[in-house]
Regions:
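Hydrophobic/aromatic residues within transmembrane alpha-helices
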Residues: 18, 30, 81-82, 139
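Glycine-rich beta-to-alpha active-site loop
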Residues: 56-103, 107, 127, 132
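A glycine-rich helix N-cap at a beta->alpha junction
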Residues: 45-46
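Hydrophobic, secondary-structure "cap" segments at the distal end of domains
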Residues: 112-122
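Amphipathic alpha-helical segments at domain termini/boundaries
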Residues: 127-180
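A structural preference for short, pocket-lining loop segments at secondary-structure junctions
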Residues: 1-42, 54-69, 91-95
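Glycine-rich phosphate-binding loop at the start of an alpha helix
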Residues: 28, 49, 53, 76, ...
Length: 180
């Protein structure tokens, strides 16, 4: 929440690039961490889920363009984080998906809704019900990502893309509206 709050309060912001400095974007939650969570009361679980949703919604609602650079695996909650960005650029070797559904856990941070708005209900249903990890080319075909590049070019394209948004060459405001 502090990162989102810092971005919201920054008067000089023009755009946000979301990127991991590690080999992978975000693997998502460690499923073993869910065991103690599921032992909590229904109210405590709702509070946790709503809190995470609130943070992601605030990021999605930023008044500047946002781009996620997916440099490795972005799975489960990690992919849901990518979906909150206005645009997603993916490395050729990266993979995305919602594998938690194989365990009977539905995406809890808005991923189901965001993916269906971005890629269409048919593709979202396939992704959610399969729990499959998807290659970059497949994600691009269903519009789950906006571009696929060699990993060495990811940062460069991300910078160029956000600058095009800031300069008004890409209508990022329209994209925000389309995702709602």
């Amino acid at each position: 929440p502090k990162v989102v709050e810092t971005i919201e309060n920054c008067q000089e912001k023009k755009g946000v690039i979301l990127r991991s400095n590690k080999d992978h974007f975000i693997f998502g939650a460690d499923i073993t961490e869910f065991v103690p969570l599921f032992k909590k009361s229904e109210e405590e679980i709702k509070t946790w889920v709503h809190g995470m949703n609130g943070i992601l919604n605030r990021f999605e609602d930023l008044d500047v363009p946002t781009v996620a650079l997916i440099n490795g695996y972005a799975l489960g909650g990690g992919f849901e984080v990518c979906l909150m960005a206005d645009y997603r650029i993916m490395s050729l070797k990266a993979k995305v998906g919602l594998p938690e559904t194989k365990l009977g856990i539905m995406p809890g941070w808005g991923g189901s809704v965001r993916l269906s708005r971005i890629s269409g209900a048919d593709h979202a249903i396939e992704w959610i019900t399969s729990g499959k990890q998807w290659k970059a080319e497949d994600a691009f075909k269903v519009r789950a990502v906006d571009a696929v590049v060699d990993g060495a070019e990811l940062d460069k394209l991300g910078d160029e893309f956000i600058q095009s948004c800031i300069a008004g060459k890409i209508n990022w405001k329209k994209r925000k509206i389309e995702k709602k």
